[in-house]
UniProtKB/Swiss-Prot annotation:
Domain description: The U-box domain is required for the ubiquitin protein ligase activity.
Pathway noted in the entry: Protein modification; protein ubiquitination
Gene coding for it: UBE4A
Name listed for the protein in its UniProt record: Ubiquitin conjugation factor E4 A
UniProt GO cellular component terms: cytoplasm; nucleus; ubiquitin ligase complex
Chain positions covered by the region annotation Disordered: 33-56
Amino acid sequence: MTDQENNNNISSNPFAALFGSLADAKQFAAIQKEQLKQQSDELPASPDDSDNSVSESLDEFDYSVAEISRSFRSQQEICEQLNINHMIQRIFLITLDNSDPSLKSGNGIPSRCVYLEEMAVELEDQDWLDMSNVEQALFARLLLQDPGNHLINMTSSTTLNLSADRDAGERHIFCYLYSCFQRAKEEITKVPENLLPFAVQCRNLTVSNTRTVLLTPEIYVDQNIHEQLVDLMLEAIQGAHFEDVTEFLEEVIEALILDEEVRTFPEVMIPVFDILLGRIKDLELCQILLYAYLDILLYFTRQKDMAKVFVEYIQPKDPTNGQMYQKTLLGVILSISCLLKTPGVVENHGYFLNPSRSSPQEIKVQEANIHQFMAQFHEKIYQMLKNLLQLSPETKHCILSWLGNCLHANAGRTKIWANQMPEIFFQMYASDAFFLNLGAALLKLCQPFCKPRSSRLLTFNPTYCALKELNDEERKIKNVHMRGLDKETCLIPAVQEPKFPQNYNLVTENLALTEYTLYLGFHRLHDQMVKINQNLHRLQVAWRDAQQSSSPAADNLREQFERLMTIYLSTKTAMTEPQMLQNCLNLQVSMAVLLVQLAIGNEGSQPIELTFPLPDGYSSLAYVPEFFADNLGDFLIFLRRFADDILETSADSLEHVLHFITIFTGSIERMKNPHLRAKLAEVLEAVMPHLDQTPNPLVSSVFHRKRVFCNFQYAPQLAEALIKVFVDIEFTGDPHQFEQKFNYRRPMYPILRYMWGTDTYRESIKDLADYASKNLEAMNPPLFLRFLNLLMNDAIFLLDEAIQYLSKIKIQQIEKDRGEWDSLTPEARREKEAGLQMFGQLARFHNIMSNETIGTLAFLTSEIKSLFVHPFLAERIISMLNYFLQHLVGPKMGALKVKDFSEFDFKPQQLVSDICTIYLNLGDEENFCATVPKDGRSYSPTLFAQTVRVLKKINKPGNMIMAFSNLAERIKSLADLQQQEEETYADACDEFLDPIMSTLMCDPVVLPSSRVTVDRSTIARHLLSDQTDPFNRSPLTMDQIRPNTELKEKIQRWLAERKQQKEQLE
């Protein structure tokens, strides 16, 4: 029978309709033939069988209706077998049948399959796949080095189908198995119920074979299995079908966990992390690809088994070497930033190159673009950490240990030498970018309890910071992973060992980790920013000078300026991402609340109201490291300098900061370190409204801050705290205290000026002055009296120093203009230039400070008079004012006429105006006017006449000039009278003269230990600065001195006699 007849017979068979196609029916018949052949071979020959029509028809391919009907008893099984074959072909895209495609139907058959020739030969006549050989077939497919060379058409279609070729000929076996898994999933949803177990079995085969591939990757030639896994995940993220891939991976991971005989699960997965490490380390912050890789890691940190491998994988080889943490996978991620990778090297840096050629708007756009990436980047890192903390106690312990060990190994970043030796620094410690990013992520973890009224916030237990070294098991039990905090200096010394709880909550640990990270990172970078800013200013001045003088160094200076500006803009951008700043402000405001609650002895979880006077019970502060408060202050100062708008938009939170400043600035019992307390004055300056704010109609600028500051409930206590710290920093015990105190007091002057302009603060200051006036001879000098004494000390020293520096600058400028420097060697000339620059910087500093001190005295004397005119202070302030007038309006003023007053912040007109204002404020007091002529060193009627002339020259108001002229006349009259009296008393014996001042004593007193008699006003002035006997250094207070009544009476009798003698002579 011909093929055509055979086909016709089958097509006319009514049972053929049960098959999907004519080819299927033919295949069924072939199977029947094979089975019958096998049966006939096994049975002995029989005459009856020789005429068997079925056998004959099979031999002759004669498929009659009767013959097919007789074999239908196995039709259902055979049909199922054919369907299994097709299903296997659809799932795995493999086949054993390479017959003519035209004889195959396209119904249910893939258009392209890989023909497994060797297996087909091995199975001889079987050209179908079933559940008994599918595993072997799949394995054979996986071993093919180039499956694309084995593709065959399964249908007669001639249409080019590239996707079918790609899918069937997929060379990467991991991707191939994943695709098989997806096709098996689809089959499960479509196949009849009787085929469902086989579809599930095929799906399981993809998983088990993927497990095998990962366990024994070496047997698959030219296949980088782990690369393929990463690429598959990467493609899934970019193609938005990541959940499908993770479903597949979950099953593979489960299979690997159950079979660790060949390789452990970590051994299998570590190469994946190696690949991620190698790829991520070369990526930049603003590359989209980076975020796809981070999403892969986010999945790994959510998957419990992968997360365990991850936390083990990131452990550094040497946990004591801080820099090693940066080389781990997590460390590499944390090191990605817009900061320079190699400090000082701007070549190949991708941000803010040639900034002078960019407009401010272009720079702002680039900054905003970087900030968008930073916000996304920090969110990814935060989610990774959060996943690990929440996944299991094991991963939580591991990641917290990593963080704690990392911070401890990098503790040296805060040492002074570290900043002075950068080449060693970067070999020993992780980078600034590392800690900036880690800080940003940890800040996000803290946000749930970073609310001022959060009950969780007050569950922080400061004794955590006092714990000594623990072993790993103890750390796990107690939830303590930070190391070395017990060696940190705390706010106050501890009196006794604290009572430690059995364990600590995550709030405590998070706060400690975050604050220390900010201290190592943000705090240090802020210092860098300030130095860069200063260097930029110096370079700008030098560049401008070089351009004006046509110096060949101009180009070099410009290049230096460009490079430094790139560093500055990169650093500023890295530190000012808005969400990070807001999160940090939330934390620091919460820290202010926490420290205030600890300072008033609150050990509960609910905040209590602040009241004055402060209650006792603040021992918990003995376990709070100073860097908690230092971070708070440092961050607010940073905002004032580089992101002031954040302060204004969060003004309502600043009341909590004012509470903190009020308590700690004025309380040495709660904050022992005078330097830290002095820094709080700078913090106060940072959060208060700007004095020199330029109005901006689009922004409320300082409105909100002004409202908070002016309506502050504890204004009197804040004013007193400020004055107290002004006094306290005079004696810090530091060998450099003399130089330091001026820097510490710099921000205090504008604060005092602002306070004086606000009614509540001004009245508080006046109350302090009134108290001082009534207690001048108290055992301890009143606070405000000591403040005024130090203020005058500063004014005298600062303006005197400024005058000296200006005189030196004047001389050097004359020498330079005359050409005297031209003949010098280049080195000698450089030294001269450097000396002139140094004098200029010193003169500028002293001028700024003296302007502030004299200005402060000018506004204080407008309403506070009694203290200034008291003998304790009057002589000193008068001698100071006259001395300065002598230099500013007298013949000596020519020595101060440098080329450019503004370059050195020298404001002689303002100084003269302020000094005259002080005179006019106090001139109504007769005693004060009478004391002016007693200044024999500087006072003369001519001096005041010269002052009037200068006031006219600088166009001061006429009423001021007239008032000062009248005052000068009154003082001159009193001077004439005093001169006559001095002539009368000129021959006073030494017994009547003050041994210190050599003036006639008015109120002699005896010092208890040295038994020396001095004038009361003299010793009172001395004790304001030094509470010791000036003759033997024994401790001394005003209440210990005794009046020398007998000597006083003798002096008064002698004066009366001299006066009587004079009258008789007249």
